[in-house]
Design a protein with these regions (language model features):
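N-terminal, polar/charged subdomain of small-to-medium soluble alpha/beta proteins
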Residues: 1-95, 106
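Well-ordered alpha/beta subsegment
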Residues: 99, 104-107
Length: 107
């Protein structure tokens, strides 16, 4: 089960609760999250925010290809993956990407 979405920052924000809602199931024994945020510097230069731009269909296709590669190599049953990435301006400490993975076993 895979959920992917590009979020328009001018319309909405990425919310971890969306990942929790998608991944919450009594079928899963483990859930892990990665949350990317904007930091205040890059290569020793001050940063006040980042503007992300991409062709949505290409990004979604890349996420799907990564999912399919992992699925074929690891053969993990009863899994769910949630990926949302922001598009547009993201300020300091704001979320830019959320990746969540849930599976049946913790090994």
């Amino acid at each position: 089960m895979l959920h992917t979405k590009i979020i328009d920052a001018s319309v909405e924000k990425i919310e971890i609760s969306n990942a929790e809602d998608f991944l919450n199931s009594s079928k899963f024994g483990a859930i892990i999250y990665f949350v990317g945020t904007v930091r205040d510097n890059n290569e020793n230069k001050e940063v006040t925010g980042i503007t992300y731009d991409a062709k949505d269909s290409m990004v979604i296709k890349s996420f799907e290809e990564i999912y399919e590669d992992v699925e074929s190599e690891l053969n993990i049953k009863n899994k769910a993956v949630f990926i949302e990435h922001i598009k547009g301006y993201v300020g300091l400490s704001e979320k830019s990407i959320i990746i969540g993975v849930a599976c049946m076993h913790r090994d």
